[in-house]
Amino acid sequence: MAVVKSSEIEKGSFLLIKGAPHIVLEREFSKTGRGGAIVRLKLKNLKNKFVIRETLKGADTAEAIEIYEVSAQYLYKDKDVLVFMDLETYDQVSLDLKESANLQDKVPFLQESEIYSLVTFDNVVIDIKLAPKIAFEVVEVEAAVKGDTVTNAMKNITLNTGLVVKAPLFINVGDKVLINSETKEYAERIKN
């Protein structure tokens, strides 16, 4: 781990703040007339996803850290444990959801045999990178009455992972759809 001056910190840098890994979301540098330089940072904790703000003076330093990404294939979920296979070493990686509460919101998007990037810090997986839009198959749709369409009417659909989202009335069982992984909302239907 390297020590960096506050003036060298850039957007996208990884820092160790109060013992936890953070990514710099925003950086604002201002130089006051008498007081010297100030760097205001907006940071996202990579373990619990909380966003904090820090202000550093010009002479302050921070600890830069290395974050690694490992390509892994999702194998299965066994109760509260996600099991992946590291594609480089072919070792199995088990992630206990009780110990990694921030990974809970990723579970509905994980599909068996798909490849994901596991973000690691200090040899511990702290995040699973998802694509912005993910393809799913519709396995169940809620019945909708066609006459109730004053505006764009939506209905609940259940996807192959169990995730339930709202989608337009024209979506049927067996259709493939793209879902926004950030908002958990329907994005579009995939044409065959």
Swiss-Prot record:
This protein's GO cellular component annotations are: cytoplasm
User: From the UniProt record, which GO molecular function terms apply?
Assistant: translation elongation factor activity
What's the domain of life for this entry? Bacteria
Q: In which pathway does it act?
A: Protein biosynthesis; polypeptide chain elongation
Disulfide bridges in this chain: none
Q: Which UniProt keywords apply?
A: Cytoplasm, Elongation factor, Protein biosynthesis
One GO process term, biological-process aspect: peptide biosynthetic process
InterPro entries for this protein: Elong-fact-P_C (IPR015365), NA-bd_OB-fold (IPR012340), Rib_uL2_dom2 (IPR014722), Transl_elong_fac_P/YeiP (IPR020599), Transl_elong_KOW-like (IPR013185), Transl_elong_P/YeiP_cen (IPR001059), Transl_elongation_fac_P (IPR011768), Translation_prot_SH3-like_sf (IPR008991)
> Per the annotation, which location comes first and is thus the protein's main one?
cytoplasm
Q: Where in the cell is it found?
A: Cytoplasm
Query: HAMAP family attached here?
Result: EF_P (MF_00141)
Family indicated by similarity? Belongs to the elongation factor P family.
Name the job this protein performs: Involved in peptide bond synthesis. Stimulates efficient translation and peptide-bond synthesis on native or reconstituted 70S ribosomes in vitro. Probably functions indirectly by altering the affinity of the ribosome for aminoacyl-tRNA, thus increasing their reactivity as acceptors for peptidyl transferase.
Protein's recorded name:
Elongation factor P
